[in-house]
Amino acid sequence: LRSALDCAYWDLFGKLENKSFLELNSIETQQLPESSITISVAPIEEQLQKITKSDWNKFKVKWNHYDEKALDLLLKCEKEIALDANGSFSISECQQLEENPLSVQFTYIEQPMKTGISNYSHLNASKFANWMADEDCQEQTKLSDLKSHYKTINIKLVKTGGLTPALELIKEARANDFKIMIGCMTESTVGISAGA
């Protein structure tokens, strides 16, 4: 509800001022943001079939467990692939991934383990894997605590409380040299368009 009200405020303010959100916040857009399509959890053969049939060139593939064979197949598919582990990897599986030079081929690997410092403290941002914090990055999260473990954060308007707190989180993320993705959950097209 908080996110919906905040986004509605910015929409109304923009209409009253006859300016876009970007103009109101002096945000430069020299480069258009890129997007990807999400491939749901399924056997790897089905996921690869969806990737092959798609006109998209960037994909986020969702997993619910670690699978070495599937990992190799994704690395060989010659597409831009990001991996969303949904917190399903173990510490040893994450350590194996971050030591593997081929891990750099994944755009990012999102929320590899269950949330909490007891898990993400085992991730090393200076190694090969581009770890992305999702559930580990909430509105109240101190990004400086994540810095040595994650390279990228996923900012979702619904979990941050709207555009206003998201702007603050983006400023803090940039100050800490994080890469940033604006993600979504199960919002309507109206909710998703606010993030775009």
Please describe what each predicted stretch is.
Residues L5, Y9-F13, A166, G191-G195:
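Buried hydrophobic packing segments
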Residues L1-I81, N86-Q95:
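N-terminal capping/lid subdomain adjacent to the active-site entrance of alpha/beta enzymes
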Residues V61, Y66-A194:
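Catalytic core of soluble alpha/beta enzymes
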